[in-house]
Amino acid sequence: MIKSVILAAGKGTRMKSDKPKVLHTIFDKTLLGYIIDAVNKTGLADENFVIVGHQAERMEEFLKNNYQNAKPVLQSPQLGTGHAVSMVVPYLKDFKGQVIILNGDLPLIRPETIKEIIEFHNSNGSDLTIMSAIFDNPTGYGRVIKNEQGHVEAIIEEKDTTPEQKAVKEINAGVYVLNWEKINPAFAELKSDNAQGEYYLTDIVKWANKQNMKVKAYILKDNEELFGINCKAQLAEATKMMNRRVINKHLENGVQIVDPETTWISPETEIGADTIIYPYCYINGKNIIGKNCKIGPFAHLRGDVILEDEVKIGNFVEVKKTRMKSHTNACHLSYIGDSEFGSNVNIGAGTITANYNPLTKEKSKTILEDNVKIGSNSVLVAPVTVKEGANVGALSVITKDIPAWALAITRAPLRVLECWVKKHLE
């Protein structure tokens, strides 16, 4: 098994936020979460070390609540990327395996890419492997300098390049795989004699070459994975990139998405073939949508939603933490939360599941069994169960369980006051 080191100590000043950069979200999942999950999905890492610094306590709390195999390691003061990695040296004194180092603001990197760079490292017998990319316009990036045998000799920051080096289009992508036992002594020998007075991680390349070690570069196949996030504009752009990636996957798997430009689907949503997603839908969090469903237009699924086959969620319907069995419809203007619906259930327009008690701050469940019909503009006050086949009349407020095959009506009887308007106009 390998270890990962994820660099996440920075503040992210350009984000203009009180929140650490890596705790900003795409589809309600943090940038840091995407990186940790990508590493975990490879099945190769048994431990992740996350370097924290800015708002360290907040970062530690996030890791404690969400990632049990991620250990926060404090970097204080923050003296550069090389210094950051050196913070894990005491934790890996006897470790003889491999370590992968990644930046915490690369949410688009795929698990497959992480596996590939590790396999590349092993198949080439490298001591140190860096991830690189070929850019037509490499301006602003450090250049990867190789010898005639294709071994990496150095990573040179652009401001320090010669004209010949500046013409190189292969850049440093900021991901490293190293044989820990061989490379970790480098961190004690890094120097801060540069304009920033920092210890650079890139200097381990020169160190390894001085020790006659083998340093290779794995060239990234899809440069989009390298897209880093330093400001809110880049966060928005990364969200678009991820969304397009997700949509393309669903299109390839037989889902019909009428307008990909106005449809947003989280990476953790599963959708069955022949389901149709109409324009202006926002599907967030973890969801499972079956086959031959119809979603939208203007629908919002907020996470933990399971829709079995041939379910319809129509325009201006919001659903969260709900399971609906097959052939159930909620087609118009409804809020459905914390619910379980059977099959062949029909939800009339304007129906609300009142799931939240503001006094106790608790949420309760609404259960509708098979073949239940709910009339328009009804409110189901949870906790409540409507048994099989029961009907609820329009404009009803349901606060008690309804027995099977019953009709429940709570609205006031109709009153007609003849000539009332005419009398008031006289």
Kindly give the residue locations of the regions a language model identified.
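N-terminal nucleotide-binding beta1-loop-alpha1 segment
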Residues: 1-17
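Hydrophobic targeting segments
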Residues: 2-6, 32, 47-50, 231
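Short aromatic/basic micro-patch
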Residues: 25, 108, 177, 228-229, ...
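Conserved N-terminal catalytic core of the sugar/cofactor nucleotidyltransferase
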Residues: 31-102, 108-112, 116-119
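Conserved donor-nucleotide/metal-binding helix-loop-beta segment in metal-dependent transferases, i.e.
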Residues: 112-139
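Rossmann-like NAD(P)H-binding beta-loop-alpha module
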Residues: 133-164
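Catalytic-core segments of class I nucleotidyltransferases/pyrophosphorylases
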Residues: 153-240
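Structural signal for interior beta-strand "rungs" in well-ordered beta-sheet cores
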Residues: 256-410, 414-415
